[in-house]
Amino acid sequence: MPLQKNQILILRIERLSSDGSGVAHSADGEAVFVPGTAPGDEARVRIVKDCGRYAFGILDELLTPSPDRIPVDCPVAGPCGGCSLRHLDYAAELRAKQESVLDAFRRIGGLEVPVLDILPSPEVDRYRNKVQFPVGVDKNGAPCIGFYAGRTHRIVPCPDCRLQPGVLNEIGNALCAFFAQQGIRPYDEQSGKGLVRHIFLRRGAHSGQIMVCLVCTRAKLPHAEQLCIALREQFPAISTILLNVNAKNTNVILGGENHILYGPGYIEDTLCGVPVRLGPLSFYQVNTLAAERLYGVAAQYAQLTSDDALLDLYCGIGTIGLSMADQCRELIGVEIVPEAIESAKANAARMGEAVAAKSRFFCADAGQAATQLAAEGLHPDIVMLDPPRKGCDEATLSAVVRMAPRRVVYVSCNPATAARDAAWLEKNGYHAEKVQPVDLFPRTKHVEAIVSLQREI
């Protein structure tokens, strides 16, 4: 019998789903997904939607808490939704993420591949090097920073996000105070009025340099010079301030037009010893210390020799390939974002003449570039894949197979698509040897996975 809306069930949560919701089963065996619960919870659950084979519920009352539960130390963790696992002990969170990776490779990939023990993040809180605060108004009508409530564009004020370094929260609050003082209004999606849409901040984990980027609907910011002086006096680590123009009615945060208000327009940092320049459009892992663990594993799986050519598809600003440049004969990087490719070239140059001479970076779609390179007869020894969440399309994977690299290392932010793509490669001459989960996003549902694949034919 289908479950009814508002029906109350007493359920025991068995595990977490890939989106961080608790999973339980009704008396009839129907799966029920309940956000904000933990494995081992006994809970009174209210059904909000039945979809036939599964249903969604909300926590009505926690009857017996799981031993894995911890007090939630953020007052807006629920409505904000960014920290979907903030109620879980970190050891339990790691177990859940480990299980989600194992489940993806078994259920989606159909692969019985060894999934190694997950590598934890060195920092569980304050680990992010980037934040994009939407700017709205609080209950008193004053400008405020916050985050969108789940599946809405309603801003939940959040003056102290626990995932961000404290200084980034302080800068966001200081900017809002300046906006209030000067009568600068946040952008309102409904009316289309207002100026400031987002506050985009980056901080170098090793350098400490901070970039401030104000995303506005037009290119002129009132009292910009006064703002720059005030910010630099209060926060000496700020090394550049930019204004990004986004006048479109869109969910995309950044527009294509940047104006430098102060400094060089970028910050500098290092990742695995690679010097990097980061602007507003640079793709960069948000957890630097955990990313260094991730890239270290990728280098181990690549098993490079000094005679090898390394092809780095979806290379971003070049960090993962450049971190291995001293181990190979040649490095070729491909990325579709022009600014990222320019940064990759500059990063290679800053590593010295020897690295710059052996490195080539091309601005192109990774799939199209792989197809073209395969047609030209390129045969790299190692291919590094680091695609977006949607994974690789079949044309890209086919091109990789035609190039016949000795090894493929697949770095993924989505274990489901990694499992799918690894299964395709398994059917086309490659053996998935092992998978290493790495936690780059503590307190959230997200987990990275690295797949080591060896050519069999």
Where are these regions (language model features)?
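Terminal RNA-binding accessory module
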Residues: 1-72, 76, 361, 367
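Rossmann-like S-adenosyl-L-methionine
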Residues: 2-7, 12, 18, 219, ...
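Short, acidic/hydrophobic/Gly-rich beta-strand patch recurrent on exposed beta strands
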Residues: 22-27, 146-149, 213-215, 344
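Short, conserved phosphate/pyrophosphate- and ester-handling motifs at nucleotide-, phospho-/glycolipid
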Residues: 40, 164, 287
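Hydrophobic beta-strand signal
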Residues: 44-46, 132, 311
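Extended interfacial segments that mediate partner engagement and assembly in macromolecular machines
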Residues: 60-72, 78-186, 206, 221
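Flexible loop/N-cap segments at domain edges
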Residues: 199
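Structural signature of eukaryotic scaffold interfaces centered on beta-propeller domains
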Residues: 202-204
